[in-house]
A protein has these predicted regions:
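Conserved catalytic core of nucleotide polymerization and phosphodiester-bond processing enzymes
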Residues: 1-136
Length: 136
């Protein structure tokens, strides 16, 4: 799909474009925009470059879509007034939640599981501890 269309779409419709071109029958040649590639490789048939990364871009881009959707919905639910989102690491959300705010934690967990309508259920792994250092 990336080779023919020139892009892939993530789960929520963001596009990852493949606008660079390289010689079809050579490996390791530098990729250029289409007009530049015609200048650099005038007698060679061209193909889109980097399309081998399309599947990974689809998976990681869709994961980012889901994570961002969860963050927005947790914010819109007003939960960030009660719990503290400390950081994100790839598809992970790290919170600091007081023990007396477990209801907010459970609500945010439910939002993470349902933030995107999928045919298969999303699972969420949880690790808890009294401090960041006690979490394994």
């Amino acid at each position: 799909v990336a080779s023919s269309r020139g892009y892939i779409k993530t789960l929520l419709g963001r596009k990852r474009r493949f606008n660079m071109w390289e010689p079809r029958d050579s490996w390791g040649e530098r990729a250029y925009s289409l007009s530049e590639a015609h200048s650099h490789y005038p007698k060679q048939e061209l193909k889109r470059a980097y399309t081998h990364t399309a599947m990974n871009a689809l998976i990681q881009g869709s994961s980012a879509d889901i994570t961002k959707s969860a963050m927005i919905k947790i914010y819109e639910a007003g939960l960030l007034d009660e719990i503290d989102l400390k950081l994100t690491v790839h598809d992970e959300l790290d919170f600091s939640i007081p023990w007396n705010k477990q209801k907010c934690f459970e609500e945010s967990l439910q939002i993470m599981k349902t933030c995107v309508d999928l045919k298969v259920p999303l699972t969420v792994d949880v690790e808890k501890g009294d401090s960041w250092g006690t979490i394994k």
